[in-house]
Amino acid sequence: FKEKVAIVMQGPIVTKDSFTYETLKIYRKRFPKISLILSTWNEYSKDELNKFKAINVEIIRNTKPDYSGISNINFQIESTKNGIFKAKELGFKYCLKTRTDQRIYRHDFILFFLSLLDIFKIENKNLRKRLIIASLNTYKYRLYGVSDMLMFGHIDDMFKYWNVSFDKRVLKDVEMGVSALEYSKACICEVYLCTEFLKKINYCISFT
């Protein structure tokens, strides 16, 4: 494919079976010309990260936010946002956001994602393209709770989604109720990310 694509992998490095490293090795072998960005934490030494640099992985060593947020949402925001910003800074047009504990085995997944964006056009002046997300962890009755595990799209749309303020609320102060609707309206975690994004593109959030 001719488009400039970056893969942003965010989160703590999974050292068991060298999972994160081996995943990036697979991506590097499969896609020698794309950018691989590992957005992780500054708790790892430069020596620990040298093997990633040896396979031409761009490393971002982030400082963890003072407050992790509910279910570590602020950690995810920080590492993802900074990784996507680096891809944007380097001039990449498209970006895949994935996690350090996940691996995609399909050999042509980048081309598949690009084809989906080309086939399914979007008419929204506030977005360049659609955003592709995984069905895994996307639930029918959790309104606006799209999965945050994997996302692919135009770099501008991706940055718009993840360039969000930290959620400073603590769980004990959040009224979540007992129904799926009440939980959704609490706007925590995935719902927080999605609803904040929808506000930016002037979408009416109705919880219906």
Where in this protein do the model-derived segments appear?
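Short, well-formed alpha-helical segments that are part of the catalytic scaffolds
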Residues: 14-29
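Short acidic, S/G/P-rich loop/turn micro-motifs used as interaction or catalytic elements
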Residues: 12-17, 43-44, 102-105, 157-159
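Short loop->beta transition adjacent to catalytic acidic/histidine clusters or analogous donor-positioning motifs
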Residues: 3-5, 28-38, 57
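Catalytic core and acceptor-binding pocket of nucleotide-sugar-dependent glycosyltransferases
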Residues: 104-110, 114-208
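N-proximal low-complexity "stem/linker" segments adjacent to membrane-targeting elements
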Residues: 1-18
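Short beta-strand-to-loop acidic/aromatic patch adjacent to the donor-nucleotide binding site
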Residues: 92-103
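A short acidic (Asp/Glu
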Residues: 18-21, 47-50, 71, 105-111, ...
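Active-site-proximal specificity loops/subdomain of glycosyltransferases
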Residues: 39-90
